[in-house]
Amino acid sequence: MDINNITAVYFVGAGGIGMSALIRYFLSKGKKVGGYDKTPSGLTEQLNYEGAAIHYEDNVDLIPDDFTDPAKTLVVYTPAVPEDHSELCYFRGNGFEVMKRARVLGEITGCNRGLCVAGTHGKTTTSSMVAHLLKQSHVDCNAFLGGILKNYDSNLMLSDKSDLTVIEADEFDRSFHWLKPYMAVITAADPDHLDIYGTPEAYRESFEHFTSLIRPDGCLLMKQSINVTPRLQEGVKFYTYTGAFDAKELSTFNFQLSTGSPDFYAENVRIGGGEIFFDFVGPDVRIPDIQLGVPVKVNIENGVAAIALAWLNGVTPEEIKHGMATFAGPRRRFDFHLKKENIVLIDDYAHHPAELKASILSVKELYAGRKVTGIFQPHLYTRTRDFAADFAASLSLLDELILLDIYPAREEPIPGVTSQIIFDAVTIADKRLIRKEELLDVVAAEAGNLEVVLMVGAGNIELLVDPVKQILDKKE
């Protein structure tokens, strides 16, 4: 099926952040768009407002007539939807073209110069930085992002003058293997999604295969410490980068490199007064006094990768400095909700032990000497089972921990796997395990003792951020 010739697109699992970018894309092309999701959300309601027709019951009778012609309708689904889903089975049994989200994204972007950002963590922020740097410059771009970029209040950007397309390359279910990168970034390859991959080795191999897809006239930019062996086609250039970030020594920025100097890096890093500045250094380029619009330490390495990709595609040093300073970040990626003298509230999407550690260390560096309280909701039973000890080690870096129940997402419970196995291994004394429904009462009771609060997780903890903010905002 030629995607350009269809008149209607139906999404099964329409509420996912990646699906929503495709929904917005097809709406912009004048297609009729509908779909199903399990639960309503602010995002699905916004998509309905923009012209989609999304319902919330798995019921074939609710599929509108606009989406019942197999010759004119494309059906897009996400791997999170179970195979026995009634609507999905209806479409498969009646001659419809049914494609995974990742394949459709690959079809849409395959003819463009794709700037694909992959990695266990850091990919949403880095791809959003790249998109903003290009969009606000003379270069311009299209973008399909995995987060709502606050500068544009969207995860989709379109351009009528540029074929550069920034793509968040998702490794879940090997989705990024459908892409055809012109340039690619790998920010991290810490094993994750072991329910899909089985072993850490298989997970890393998927990234190695991803590097083999880069066009011969393109390049790979990879964080230096990553344990991935690229399989590049002849002609593909290879660069390394680092953020000059030593997580073991909070106050020290240095390089402990075993493989030589990186091609791109930060130096002369200055942190203070809630701001971060650094100098960007690369082959034949040095840009002094870069200011991070989202001043958190982990964004130094994200920023180096984004600046390098922008510079390689013609963005000027002046445009880079302006873009980095004005970057507001994607929602739920180090998202400041309160930033007052007596209380700070940050919401972050971290849901893997490595990114959780980076988030906590970044907060402790930015607010040295102040008590940091973490409110963490584990995401998925399998991830909790596979990384319980690592989660506990990261959470033990906090001054105080409030741990919530596991958010199951697509999974059924696993016997013996609860937040308790993380809680028992956390080594700090100031910790408590509560149900999500108890959180607001706990925060209200403890508000006077809270200084810096970090709410973390990829589940529905985000629904509690505003209520927590309302409580803390009243703190004297």
Set out the residue ranges of the language-model regions.
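C-terminal helical cap/extension that packs against the catalytic core
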Residues: A392-L450
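Short, basic, low-complexity termini and linkers enriched in Ser/Thr/Gly/Pro
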Residues: P230, V236, A247-S261, G448-N449, ...
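Phosphate-binding loop of NTP-binding sites
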Residues: Y25-K31, L62-F67, P79-Q224, V228-K237, ...
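Conserved hydrophobic helix-helix packing surfaces used for dimerization/oligomerization
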Residues: A8-V9, V75, L115, C141, ...
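N-terminal leader/targeting and accessory segments in enzymes
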Residues: M1-K100, V104, C219, L250-G260, ...
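Short acidic/histidine-rich motifs immediately flanking catalytic phosphotransfer sites
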Residues: T68-L74, D163, N449-E451
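Short internal beta-strands
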Residues: K31-K38, L220-Q224, T373-F376, L398-P408
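Nucleotide phosphate-binding/pyrophosphate-handling subdomain across enzymes
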Residues: D2-A8, G18, Y25, K29, ...
